[in-house]
Amino acid sequence: MVFLSIPNGKTLSIDVNPNSTTISAFEQLAHQRSDVPQSFLRYSLRMRNPSRVFVDSKDSDSILLSDLGVSRFSTVIIHVLLLGGMQAAPPKPRLDFLNSKPPSNYVAGLGRGATGFTTRSDIGPARAAPDLPDRSALATAAAPGVGRGAGKPSEAEAEDDEEAEEKRYDENQTFDEFEGNDVGLFANAEYDEDDKEADAIWESIDQRMDSRRKDRREAKLKEEIEKYRASNPKITEQFADLKRKLHTLSADEWDSIPEIGDYSLRNKKKKFESFVPIPDTLLEKAKKEKELVMALDPKSRAAGGSETPWGQTPVTDLTAVGEGRGTVLSLKLDNLSDSVSGQTVVDPKGYLTDLKSMKRTTDEEIYDRNRARLLYKSLTQSNPKNPNGWIAAARVEEVDGKIKAARFQIQRGCEECPKNEDVWLEACRLANPEDAKGVIAKGVKLIPNSVKLWLEAAKLEHDVENKSRVLRKGLEHIPDSVRLWKAVVELANEEDARILLHRAVECCPLHLELWVALARLETYAESKKVLNKAREKLPKEPAIWITAAKLEEANGKLDEANDNTAMVGKIIDRGIKTLQREGVVIDRENWMSEAEACERVGSVATCQAIIKNTIGIGVEEEDRKRTWVADADECKKRGSIETARAIYAHALSVFLTKKSIWLKAAQLEKSHGSRESLDALLRKAVTYVPQAEVLWLMGAKEKWLAGDVPAARAILQEAYAAIPNSEEIWLAAFKLEFENKEPERARMLLAKARERGGTERVWMKSAIVERELGNVEEERRLLNEGLKQFPTFFKLWLMLGQLEERFKHLEQARKAYDTGLKHCPHCIPLWLSLADLEEKVNGLNKARAILTTARKKNPGGAELWLAAIRAELRHDNKREAEHLMSKALQDCPKSGILWAADIEMAPRPRRKTKSIDAMKKCDRDPHVTIAVAKLFWQDKKVEKARAWFERAVTVGPDIGDFWALFYKFELQHGSDEDRKEVVAKCVACEPKHGEKWQAISKAVENAHQPIEVILKRVVNALSKEENSA
């Protein structure tokens, strides 16, 4: 490089080598850089004693710069030769200054005190003012760039400028926002590289300023748009919910909708209507347009069509052309679909779907990818040893669909970071399947200790033997890699796996899984040896002791003559003590988790041994019962039945006389055990807790359900011997005999119970037996005697009144109800029965008065309000019923039966609103839930209705009417499996309440009917009631 010092004081540089550059070449370069004519150039070196250098032009092509003493970084001073003469200079024209450039910082009129002002040219007119430059200057000078960033004009723009010059007006003149209509001081300046670089910098600054807070501005704008749309919804959105309901309208309802007419026509004045006949020319033209020409013009045939007049050529029908293209595409797809050669790669059925699913790249995504590409390019250039930069750059190219560029980037990453395994893994992923093996081979050569690379190399192999060979090669370099050992063992057969595991435990003696896997593959004797070695290497590992216990249990199962259950318990006990000596903290929760894991793999004895030895660790003595019961419940919820059974067994060994634990254990056996295990548990329970009635009764019931009536009778006799004065046992014995059609034995048992001073329930059961046997007088006698002893037991008064009603003795029935209300004034069933009787005999007014009296004596009685409302509805007093309903809801705002009745009474459009109000007041009430389910049923929303029916029977399983409605729903919309499931659940819940259910189940003809039969009869009753309504 040589520096040039030119006359205007600037210093330029020329990239030349003085040892190889001649004088003539240097003069040409100096001329190009300084614009000084080559013939006027004179130069000298900058030294302490500078000397002028003169070189003959003949020798300039052979003399080098170094011959003149010029070296690298020397400074050559350029001089311009001035030539003088004897002749005077020619005079300049008088007005020549008008065509020359003004000096810098020139302000017109400044010398005479003029000041600046603003004109229209500064602001900018509506049209650009004409530019009248000098023609001679335009002819000789090149057209300058206009404005910032303008380049060299094209040929089309030059032609436009020539036309504007002829018009003396430039129509394409631009307006500069800073300099007004004048395009700037540098309008005629040359647009060089510095200007281009400055424009690029300013453009990048503008883009940067525009990108700042762009996401925040866009999010704010989006939020404002959403707020505006939320506050000003469209009409279609306001009526969207109503439009959805239009599909429920039938065809007749659609036809009944009146047509809206244009009533504005009434106010319009009728104008005079004039009719003009169509001209014949128009009709003739239309006829010709529809006409189909089948013959050619003779002239056109003679000339071969070359003389066809252009104007008479018909216009192409573009619609028909488009339809034809669609037909051709359809035929092609049909041919492809019918192809049986198997060589086509087109799926004609999914062709259009694939076109729709093609990813469209937006401008924003392209911009983001370009930015990311530049960022990662800068990262890889500044820090090429960072593998993450190369991986990220390759993935950017991959996302952009440029897989070749991605492979190139990751290849460079492998070259720059050959010791990084992630780069090689990424290169393997991006490579072709046939090249991936070569890539991973290079990686393992450079990084032979990388486990990931060896595993990836094995994954690329398709043959099991090749996979195993690769993994074994990796183990030669990394013998202590557990992952490689596991992978190679998984691929080997049982014999090879045993050999490999022997070597694996030698290389990795502190890894438990390898020891356990080896113990499972060995024989019983060898497994014990392996586990002993593992215990020596890992003395603080509890899993070894658990595996030893499982091994002992499994060996005992194989050898039926040798029961190793006791040995399993000893192993676990010894293991816990050994671990405690080693300083291992026995975590009760972890050991219980291990017990559940043992249960899942079938090692029940090991599970029981773990629970027995660890369940009491860390539990206070006073908290043992509560903690153990809670643990058993949690295990039962998780499905760990054997673990829960082991917890109950250990708890019962500590708390032998706790009835609640025996009962929970019995319930567990009833749900998940066998009849034999339940019977054995109950026998053991009544041995330790003989005074527990519920345990005796449960044992007798299980025997009865199993069909063993004599065994059930024997259990009740033992219970009677243990608890002679227990009413529950007397009644259970009565029920057993009565349900098995032994009325005489049942009557005898009840007689003995009455003699021993039986309670009111004994007298009621006695009357029920006589009612079913048809002994009316005996039934009446028992009821009267029972009422003398227990006058406040309302059920006896109800039975007496119902007895008189059955035989149409209405006065005696009224007298029985009245007398019962004197003794039981707050018994709502008695008030309801009396009101129903009065409505039948004396009409609505009497019943209304009785119900009003009942409500005064029993405030807050929702059943009384409901009875009054239904009485009004039966007599078509809908307005009075609605009035009573409003008062009832004010008096009982939390009553579910009132809200359910209110939903059913409401008109169809208002039922949804009523149901929402009801759910707000009493969400968990089963009556409201069943009312909502019926709404969905009416709207034919089957799945929602089924979900709400299931919710109702879950909340109120004791109400038989809900099960009947659910079964009726499944009869219409469910399958046979659904109906069987509903019946099974109903039988399991044994419902006893419900208006229809109680009326039908307590009828004399249904006394001994099973629950399934009663369920179907309730459904029939509901269907009849619906049809009659």
From Swiss-Prot:
Induction: Up-regulated by cold stress, but not by abscisic acid or salt treatment.
HAT repeats: 367-399, 401-431, 432-462, 463-494, 496-524, 526-554, 639-671, 673-705, 707-739, 741-772, 774-806, 808-840, 842-874, 876-908, 940-972
TPR repeats: 625-658, 794-827, 926-959
Covalent crosslink: Glycyl lysine isopeptide (Gly-Lys) (interchain with K-? in acceptor proteins): 85
Phenotype of null mutants: Lethal when homozygous.
Subcellular location: Nucleus; Nucleus, Cajal body
Organism domain of life: Eukaryota
The keyword Coiled coil is annotated on this UniProt entry: yes
Gene: STA1
Miscellaneous field: The sta1-1 mutation causes the stabilization of the normally unstable STA1 transcript and increases the expression levels of miRNA target genes.
Annotated coiled-coil segments of the chain: 210-243
Disulphide bonds in the chain: none
Species annotation: Arabidopsis thaliana (Mouse-ear cress)
Residue ranges of the region described as Disordered: 142-170
One Gene Ontology biological process: mRNA splicing, via spliceosome
PROSITE patterns associated with the record: TPR_REGION, UBIQUITIN_2
Subunit record text: Component of a pre-mRNA splicing complex. Interacts with ZOP1. Interacts with PRP31.
Annotated tissue distribution: Ubiquitous.
SUPFAM superfamilies cross-referenced by the UniProt entry: TPR-like
InterPro entries cross-referenced by the UniProt entry: HAT, PRP1_N, Syf1-like, TPR-like_helical_dom_sf, TPR_rpt, Ubiquitin-like_dom
Keywords: Coiled coil, Isopeptide bond, mRNA processing, mRNA splicing, Nucleus, Repeat, Spliceosome, TPR repeat
Protein name per Swiss-Prot or TrEMBL: Protein STABILIZED1
GO CC, one annotated term: spliceosomal complex
Function comment: Pre-mRNA splicing factor required for splicing and for the turnover of unstable transcripts. May be a U5 snRNP-associated protein involved in the formation of U4/U6-U5 tri-snRNP. Involved in responses to abiotic stresses. Involved in microRNAs (miRNAs) biogenesis by functioning in primary miRNAs (pri-miRNAs) splicing. Required for DNA methylation and transcriptional silencing through the RNA-directed DNA methylation (RdDM) pathway.
Domain Ubiquitin-like: 1-85
Record bears the keyword Metal-binding: no
